[in-house]
From Swiss-Prot:
Known partners and oligomeric status: Monomer.
Protein name: Phosphoribosylformylglycinamidine synthase
Family to which the UniProt record says this protein belongs: In the N-terminal section; belongs to the FGAMS family.
Role description: Phosphoribosylformylglycinamidine synthase involved in the purines biosynthetic pathway. Catalyzes the ATP-dependent conversion of formylglycinamide ribonucleotide (FGAR) and glutamine to yield formylglycinamidine ribonucleotide (FGAM) and glutamate.
A molecular function GO annotation: ATP binding
Pathway per the UniProt entry: Purine metabolism; IMP biosynthesis via de novo pathway; 5-amino-1-(5-phospho-D-ribosyl)imidazole from N(2)-formyl-N(1)-(5-phospho-D-ribosyl)glycinamide: step 1/2
Gene behind the chain: purL
Species of provenance: Neisseria gonorrhoeae (strain ATCC 700825 / FA 1090)
């Protein structure tokens, strides 16, 4: 059944499409669009169901669909035929929970109408513009949409005739199906199947290919190496293990699980207690830290959104499946691509070399990929707090080096109970379970495909190898895992793995093989969302959001109850055996698609030997005396590795969970310059965790081992200003990217691993976890020319550490302290090597020597001094030197404070000249030629040796100097100037001024790339509005003007009375903000309970048992029918629930708070809330983008009981939403004078604002929150529950100690209830 919806594309989206069409030379057309919905059912729906369906979808059923005609062309964009979209899964869930019987599935399409004359070829070009071929189809008419619901006929497996056709038969199958088997592996399989006297099934071959792919088995890291004719003594992995063997202390799990586990602390963890009817309680327990980082490069090249999304999702599952279950906490993301070539902003260093047709352009990757990664993290509910973004594409020694195959890195940290850190052994007879989403025909052969050079595979096989993500169901699965580990020693999970490359065919065998078991599986028990899949497709597809785990049969009822409460699908698929044999039975065809010993699959296929030789790069001396230093400064600031990353950061929720202390944004202007991320371990502690990154790929072209050491060094200098203590507390993850097989690259990889291993051992560091991606080469045919782009060896180091006190973290924001000074610590000790620098890149000047960590002991000493200064509160600001050199370091510190800097490099010049011009004897001010002076100044300002700038008080100068002297680092330290808060000029002088520029002008250049991509991706008017605020310090600044004593707890008398009103912390599937909500209300003296909508439906809880209701933030049902709409309709369409909620809202003795998704949901219940007749709905942000920011709000006088104690105050608060714009279309666009506006966005001058992003969503009158007539029901889009502690705020106002101003809201609610 088709149903017609509302307009699909906003005016600016239409305009962007028309501009793209014009750029392709397409004729002018008029474009209109609308959503269409298609409901599949086995029989015709009755009138009552159709009416409900129309209300649910806000759409109208039609008897006849419109058709294209002469001059009016229809493009019906639907989910790709043969697939089921995540949107459909969630929409169908809503329909089921709303009681709509008989609906098999609901899909959504978009009808685009083009009015004008178009040829068939032009229509094909338009079709390409209108859809993503990875996930969508374009249909010519509405009748074809019926194919969305076609079911294929089931087929059995096929075999490859190795008994009759021998090795040649397998070689042919290998090529045709993209198995990526080596010649040795083909011989191994032929030998084993001939011994078994049977032919392999296609299922077994695909399973073997995935399980033994480079992606899964890391064959190169375990290989023997012969370099320059000599066999090397150790494998790559052996050298990595050496770091752990030398320094195992502080590491709990290394090399043998989905993630590494490092030592944490005993803290009070906060979660619902099943033994106390899901009451939230603190639990004192030893809690360790999970660390994991991996890459998803190949899928991101093919389909950036889906590739990055599933990269984030897979890494999250790795964390959750560590030990016997754990909780992911905070994420990191990074991207490396070739040159962007942004239209109208092509940079002078960029040349367009071309690319293969089937991979995405670097610009498309950076428009779509970050949204995919952020969207998954956002919807799952994990803050993304750290990252990097680099572009590189240069001709070097006759080869084009770059990242046509991009790096997309996803990682993070999590928390795990000490007693859950190690998996138990699976006994015979244990049940083998799939938890999470159903199988679909996506992601076939991803492990093998990602192990091949991009372009060597058939495009259709690359296409098949990419997965699609559904974070909402992964959230449900994680809730099940949480409920299990929270049972402590009653946890039913024996062992758990995530489902990744190879799908179930890799995950289940891995699960049982770890315990030395075999297994019998029933293929038709695997949950599927598509009919007609072959056994190979069922067993090997890489559908996401799945885990495999084992439990005892006696625990099945407990596990089932948890899954049903969380509405998370699961199935018992198999049973563990003690015979070491793997059998997969197919009852449909009464055969066994898999039937072989596990040791054939996971045994010891032939060990790889790598042979390579040293290829020495050509060396050119660096010279830049003829380059204008001011122009150089602006160029360097525009290079993406240096430039602002706002467009990557504000799309990602950075506060969900309420544990964030330090995100990327720093200071009262929220400038993206943080060196590292810091989280808190719990709500009752200042202990925490920190993570940082280091990567230097361009340096590897000059000296690969040096690049490895520099990566380690950068990770340390980035994390050094956090209160960690001994350097050995820091643990590293190493992700290795290389174009192995390209001459010289295997040798570089070996020597770099060797160098990093030695450096880490010298630094007392270990690498307990890592990953590799060793096919970083793109090849393609361009007409008659064969082209290739080879990535430099690329190591990414991620550092993780426990933190003693998060409050001592020092940021790059300069402080307005009279008489403060800036000290520069140069760990390059004047060498100023320029190889691989940002400066070199922006001038295509690939010359000079590579910077290096020459003495690990001196870096260790530097770290120790900074730790001492952090612990003693001697640092006002800290920023490491990295991309862009000292110039960029100082500029970013000035940007964060919006001040000037006066920097004198005389002393640096005095150190530079004896090293680089030893024969020079004159006066630099008089006798140095302009060219030599310019050359020296450029090297001093733009070299990227390790180092840092610190701001200290003048009175602490002697103490600081003494600390560096004691550490033997006096020769590294120079006083280079001071901040200037009286003007905004960034000035560098040394024997005269040579660079002086206005801060705002430099910052505009720094933010230009981010602004340009934001304009292309989002509403360009919003991007322009944000860019314009760079020069407006007054309106941009955060401040606090509170009319109450922040440190007074007005709930204290009620807490002391011992009476605890019960509050229902309400959530629906997909909600992710319940923990911090419960923690805030618990702090204010409430007795908080975890109440799922399934509990209310099943009668396990009744709202009448509670005094207050808090509806939490997140993505109920993935926001598929509009934010909060599906959640609200599951109440309104359910008579018993509707009555229960209506009675609660009518009770004069209750309070209700709805935040974010809860705000959106409660606004849709206005018809059953007394005094809410004038309320708006909340619609998509004006930017049409998810907005995560720290915004200023004002609390006007209103009837709101929970805000009563905060009236007339203004203070910063977190916002994180995609649909927060108050929309009054229901009221004819009119805002009633009776509307109870309870919260408004204001600017830095405390004026209600419409200016983006000070008003992040475009709400009229700055509306951020509203209340009903009697003030008992208050809803708001911002998140006060995430910032009720001062340490949770990215920027803490002066005078706020333990509690923030937002605690008053929760204390006010307690006071209002008496």
């Amino acid at each position: 059944m088709p149903l017609r919806g509302v307009t699909a594309l906003s005016d600016f989206r239409v305009e962007k499409l028309l501009q793209k069409a014009a750029a392709l030379g397409l004729p002018e057309v008029k474009l209109s669009s609308e959503f269409w919905y298609f409901a599949g059912s086995e029989k015709a729906l009755d009138a009552a169901t159709v009416e409900k369906l129309q209300a649910l979808l806000a759409a109208q059923s039609v008897e006849q669909t419109p058709e294209a005609r002469e001059g009016l062309h229809l493009f019906l964009v639907t989910p790709r035929l043969g697939t089921i979209s995540p949107w459909a899964s969630k929409a169908t869930n809503i329909a089921e929970n709303c009681g709509l019987a008989g609906i098999e599935r609901i899909e959504r399409g978009m009808a685009v109408w083009l009015e004008g004359a178009l040829t068939d070829e032009q229509k094909q070009q338009w079709a390409a513009l209108l859809h993503d071929r990875m996930t969508e189809s374009v249909l010519p008419d509405f009748q074809t949409a019926s194919k969305l619901f076609h079911h294929l006929k089931s087929e059995t497996f096929s075999t490859v005739d190795v008994l009759g056709g021998g090795k040649e038969a397998l070689v042919k199958a290998n090529t045709e199906t993209g198995l990526a088997l080596s010649a040795d592996e083909i011989d191994y399989l032929v030998e084993n199947y001939q011994a078994l006297q049977r032919n392999p099934s296609d299922v077994e071959l695909m399973m073997f290919a995935q399980a033994n792919s480079e992606h899964c088995r890391h064959k190169i890291f375990n290989a023997d190496f012969i370099l320059n004719g000599e066999k090397q003594p150790k494998s790559l992995f052996g050298m990595i293990r050496d770091t752990h063997n030398a320094h195992p202390e502080g590491t709990v799990v290394a090399y043998k699980d989905n993630s590494s586990v490092i030592k944490g602390a005993k803290i009070e963890r906060f979660y619902p207690n099943a033994a106390e009817n899901q009451g939230y309680r603190f639990h004192e327990e030893d809690t360790h830290i999970i660390m994991k980082v991996e890459t998803h490069n190949h899928p991101t090249a093919i389909a950036p959104f889906a590739g990055a999304a599933t990269g984030a999702g897979g890494e999250i599952r790795d964390e959750g499946a560590t030990g016997k279950g754990s909780r992911p906490k905070a994420g990191l993301t990074g991207f490396t691509v070739s040159n962007l070539n942004i239209p109208d902003l092509k940079q002078p260093w960029e040349q367009d070399y071309g690319k293969p047709e089937h991979i995405s352009s670097p610009l498309d990757i950076m428009i779509e990929g970050p949204i995919g990664g952020a969207a998954f993290n956002n919807e799952f509910g994990r803050p993304n707090l750290l990252g990097y973004f680099r572009t590189f594409e240069e001709k070097f020694d006759g080869q084009v080096r770059g990242y046509h195959k991009p790096i997309m890195i996803a990682g993070g940290l999590g928390s795990i109970q000490a007693q859950q850190t190690h998996k138990d052994e699976i006994p015979e007879g244990a049940l083998l379970i799939q938890l999470g989403g159903p199988g679909m025909l996506i992601g076939l052969g991803g492990g093998a495909a990602s192990s091949m050079d991009t372009g060597t595979n058939d495009a259709s096989l690359d296409f098949n190898s990419v997965q699609r993500g559904n974070p909402e169901i992964e959230r449900r699965a994680q809730e099940v895992i949480d409920r299990c580990w929270q049972l402590g020693d009653q946890n039913p999970i024996i062992s758990i793995h995530d489902v990744g490359a190879g799908g179930l065919s890799n995950a289940f065998p891995e699960l049982v093989n770890d315990a030395g078991r075999g297994a019998v599986f029933e293929l038709r028990e695997v949950p599927l969302e598509e009919h007609g899949l072959t056994p190979l497709q069922i067993w090997c597809n890489e559908s996401q959001e799945r885990y495999v785990l084992s439990i005892l049969e006696k625990d099945l009822d407990t596990f089932r109850a948890i899954c049903e409460r969380e509405r998370c699908p699961f199935a018992v698929v198999g049973t563990a055996t003690d015979d070491g044999h793997l059998k997969v039975r197919d009852d449909l065809f009464s055969n066994n698609p898999v039937d072989l010993p596990l040791n054939v699959l996971l045994g010891k296929p032939p060990k790889t030997t790598r042979t390579d030789k040293t290829v020495t790069p050509s060396k050119k001396p660096f010279h830049a005396g003829d380059i204008d230093i001011t122009e150089a400064a602006y160029r360097v600031l525009r290079l993406p590795a240096v430039a602002a990353k706002n467009f990557l950061i504000t799309i990602g929720d950075r506060s969900v969970g309420g544990m964030t202390h330090r995100d990327q944004m720093v200071g009262k202007y929220q400038t993206p310059v943080a060196d590292c991320a810091v989280t808190m371990m719990g709500f009752n502690t200042y202990r925490g965790e920190a993570m940082s990154m280091g990567e230097k790929p361009a340096v590897a072209l000059f000296d690969a081992p040096a690049s490895g050491r520099m990566c380690v060094g950068e990770a340390i200098t980035n994390i050094a200003a956090v209160n960690i203590g001994d350097i050995g507390n820091i643990k590293l993850s190493a992700n290795w990217m290389a174009a192995c097989g390209n001459e010289g690259e295997d040798e570089k990889l070996y020597r770099t691993v060797e160098a990093v291993s030695k450096a880490c051992q010298a630094l007392d560091l270990s690498i307990p976890v890592g990953k590799d991606s060793l096919s970083m080469k793109t090849v393609w045919q361009d007409g008659e020319e064969k082209k290739s782009v080879v990535s430099p060896l690329s190591l990414i180091i991620s550092a993780f550490a426990p933190v003693k006190d998060v409050r001592k973290t020092v940021t790059p924001e300069l402080k307005n302290v009279e008489g403060s000074v800036l000290l520069f610590i140069d760990l390059g000790f004047g060498k100023a090597r320029m190889g691989g620098s940002a400066f070199g890149q922006v001038y295509n000047n690939m010359s000079g020597d590579a910077p290096d960590l020459d003495d690990a002991g001196r870096l260790k000493a530097f770290y120790s001094v900074i730790q001492q200064l952090v612990a003693e509160d001697k640092l006002l600001a800290y920023h490491d030197r990295s991309d862009g050199g000292l110039f960029a370091t100082l500029a970013e510190m000035a940007f964060a404070a919006r001040c000037g800097i006066s920097a004198d490099i005389d002393c640096l010049m005095d150190k530079f000249l004896p090293i680089h011009l030893p024969d020079f004897q004159g006066d630099p001010a008089e006798d140095l030629s302009d060219e030599l002076y310019n050359h020296a100044a450029i090297k001093i300002l733009f070299n990227e040796e390790l180092g840092a700038v610190i701001q200290i008080r003048q009175k602490d100068r002697d103490y600081v100097d003494a600390a560096f002297e004691t550490a033997g680092l006096t020769d590294a330290v120079s006083r280079i100037g001071s901040p200037d808060f009286d003007n905004e000029f960034i000035s560098f002088f040394g024997y005269g001024y040579f660079l002086e520029q206005n801060r705002a002008d430099l910052q505009r250049a720094w933010q230009e790339t981010s602004h340009a991509i934001q304009r292309l991706r989002d509403n360009p008017a919003c991007a322009d509005s944000e860019f314009a605020l760079i020069g407006d310090n007054e309106r941009s600044a955060l401040f606090a003007d509170v009319k109450f004593d922040v440190n007074e707890d007005i709930a204290a008398p009620f807490i002391n009375s011992g009476a605890k009103p019960k509050i229902a912390i309400l959530r629906e599937q997909g909600v992710n903000g319940q923990i911090e909500m419960a923690a805030a209300f618990t702090r204010a003296g409430f007795d908080a309970y975890d109440v799922h909508m399934s509990d209310l439906m099943a009668g396990r809880f009744r709202l009448a048992d509670f005094k207050m209701l808090a509806a939490c933030g997140g993505f109920s049902y993935g926001d598929v029918l509009g934010a909060g709409e599906g959640w609200a309709k599951s109440i309104l369409f359910h008579p018993a629930l509707r009555d229960q909620f209506a009675a609660f809202f009518a009770d004069p003795n209750t309070l209700t708070l709805g935040v974010c998704n809860g705000c959106q949901m409660v606004s849709n219940l206005a018809e059953i809330i007394p005094g809410a007749e004038t309320w708006p709905k909340f619609k998509r942000n004006l930017s049409e983008q998810f907005e995560a920011r720290l915004n200023m709000v004002h609390v006007p006088k209103s009837a709101s009981l929970i805000l009563n104690e905060m009236q007339d105050s203004s203070l910063p608060v977190v916002v994180s939403h995609g649909e927060g714009r108050a929309d009054f279309a229901l009221h004819g666009g009119n805002i009633s004078a009776d509307l109870g506006i309870a919260l408004q966005y204001v600017d830095g001058q405390n004026q209600v604002t419409q200016t983006y992003p000070l008003n992040p969503n475009g709400s009229p009158q700055g509306i951020a929150g509203i209340t009903n007539a009697d003030g008992r029901v208050t809803i708001m889009m911002p998140h006060p529950e995430r910032v009720y502690r001062a340490a949770q705020m990215s920027r803490k106002p002066e005078g706020w100690t333990e509690l923030s101003g937002w605690y008053r809201l929760f204390a006010g609610a307690r006071k209002a209830l008496g």
